[in-house]
Regions:
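Aromatic-lined substrate-binding rim segments of carbohydrate-active enzymes
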Residues: 1
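Histidine-acidic metal/acid-base catalytic patches
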Residues: 17-39, 45-140
Length: 140
């Protein structure tokens, strides 16, 4: 606490820490000013939680924000690049704004499921994610 270090926990699809309700529960039970949340909407979305509901619940505890995309296929989590799935990025950004989180940068996360592929191209990936986020920003 003396050094102002913040630890940001990230919920994760396919684990026991996969819903916004559980994330808030942990924040309330620990009740420590240096323990916050990394708001990664993809994990909540993949588990079936509504984007607005997830952001509304977790916003008071968010220290950082990132996004990737994905879905469950036969019970297995499959991640994809931001903008290459079905998460409504504009809705997510509007929910961040509505919850006064625009001061936090939104990081595009690349899952090891993509980065470990033989044909992974980091430049293409960075440009694709950037363009997806900018397209959403320009629409709102």
């Amino acid at each position: 606490k003396d050094n102002n270090v913040i630890i940001a926990l990230e919920a994760h699809a396919g684990t026991d820490f996969e819903t916004p309700e559980k994330a808030v529960w942990i924040m309330e039970k620990t009740n420590h000013s240096n323990l916050r949340l990394d708001l990664d909407i993809s994990h909540f979305y993949i588990e079936g939680s509504d984007v607005d509901h997830s952001v509304d619940l977790c916003a008071p505890y968010a220290a950082m924000v990132h996004i990737k995309d994905g879905k469950k296929v036969d019970g297995e989590v499959k991640y994809c690049l931001t903008g290459d799935g079905t998460i409504n990025i504009e809705m997510f950004l509007l929910a961040l704004s509505r919850n006064n989180l625009t001061h936090l940068p939104v990081f595009a996360e690349v899952s090891v499921q993509q980065s470990s592929k033989r044909d992974y191209d980091p430049r293409f990936t960075a440009e694709f994610c950037y363009n997806s986020l900018m397209e959403a920003i320009n629409k709102i």
